[in-house]
Amino acid sequence: MINVFIPHRWNNDDYSTISSLLDRTKFKVRDYSVPASSPFDSIDRRYNVDPQIQKQIRYASVVVCSNRPANNNGMSIDEIKFALSIGKPVVAVQVTFSSSTMIAGLGVETIPCRKDSLENWIHRNV
């Protein structure tokens, strides 16, 4: 069982792209991301990452984000930074031709949006 957290925004389809890619891997996946169907009632803005989301990230074995430049700021990058700070393995799946400079600057590996690439990365990092 691989526990996964996917930092995302709901204004693009990165979450569904990454979720579908995970579903095609040979791993049984438990998704700890925040689904659109049951978002948290409120986000505590006193924190860079809301404690409810921190808890979800702590449950995850890995964090899988997109390479989208929109991840350069906002909650997604804060979630990625938090995951790295607590030692979670983080990978960016290449869903666009352009990549986030922030994600690259954090040393997050970017892999092709392919099942075998994600499986190999998980094997190396879990």
PLM segments and residue spans:
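Glycine-rich, charge-decorated loop segments at or immediately adjacent to ligand/cofactor-binding or catalytic sites
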Residues: 97-111
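A short helix->loop->beta-strand "cap" motif at the edges of active sites that frequently abuts
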Residues: 85-95
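Conserved TIR/SEFIR loop-to-helix hotspot centered on a Trp-containing motif
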Residues: 69-86
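Structural motif corresponding to alpha-helix initiation and N-cap regions
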Residues: 46-50, 77, 115
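C-terminal helix of von Willebrand factor
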Residues: 111-126
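Conserved N-terminal substructure of TIR/SEFIR domains
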Residues: 1-59, 126
